[in-house]
Amino acid sequence: MKKIAFYSILLSLAAFSFSCGGDDDTNPTKPSSNQTSISNTNVNLKVGETANVVIKNYDSLVFVNNSNIATIEKIDSLNYRIVGRKVGTTFIDLKSVKCNITINRYYAYFRDPNLSWGEGKNIVKSYELRLLKTDEPSSLLYQENNSVCLKYVHYLFSDYKLSSINMYFLPNKTVELNNYLNDYYMQSAQTDPEYDLYESPLPKTDPKFFNVKVKKTPVNFNNADYILITLSNPNFK
C-alpha cells in the first residue's frame, strides 16, 4: 500500500513538471505583433516619381519632415504613396522606426555647383571639374564644356567666404532652364520687376537655405548674351 502511494506521488510530480514546461519549452511566448513597421526604410526617387509603402500599427498622422522635398498620401488604412517633389533629403519619423527619403533630379544637364556657403576657395576648387577661366581675389569663374544649356559658373566670395553663385544659361535653352528650376527650387511668394524669384526647398532657418533669382531679360557676359541665374545665401552677403 505504501509502495502504491509512493508511485502515485512520483507520477503526480512528473505530470506537474511536464505541464509547467521549462527551458526546453517548444512553444515559447511570441513577441508582440503590434510593433510599428514600414515596408521600406530607404526610399530613393526622382522628382515627380512615386513609391508605395505599407505602414502597420501606427495610429498617428503620418507626414514627411520636409514636405517641400517629398509628400506622403494615405491610400487606405495600411497603404501610403510617397511623392518626390524637389531634390534633397528628408525622412518620415514613426517614433520606433524611420524612413529616409532621397529625391534626385529628373533632368541631368550639368554637374551641380558647389554650395559650400561660407567656405573659402579651396573647397570649391577641390570640387570643380569645369575649366577654371579666372581666379580673382573675390571670385572663381568656371567654363562648362559638357552641357547643352549651361555655359559659365561664377563663384563670388565676400570676406573670403562663398556668398553667391552666378550661372549663365544659353538664351535659347528655356525648356532646359525651366526643367532645372522645377527639379530644384520652390517659387517664391515675393515678386520683382526684373527677376523671377525662387528659393531652395530647405527651411529658411536652415543655414544652407539660399535664394534664387532669374533675370527676365538676357545679360551680356564675355561678349555674349545669357540668361542669368543667381544663387545667394542671406547669411553671407
Residue ranges of model-derived segments:
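Short, solvent-exposed loop/turn segments that connect beta-strands within catalytic domains
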Residues: 146-148, 204-207, 220-223
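Sec-dependent N-terminal signal peptides
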Residues: 6-11
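Short Gly/Thr-rich strand-loop-strand
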Residues: 187-208
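Short, exposed beta-strand-loop hairpins at the edges of beta-sheets
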Residues: 93-94, 210-224
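C-terminal motif of bacterial Sec signal peptides marking the signal peptidase cleavage site
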Residues: 16-19
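Positively charged n-region of N-terminal signal peptides that target proteins for export
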Residues: 1-4
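Solvent-exposed beta-strand/loop surfaces of large extracellular or lumenal domains
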Residues: 71-73
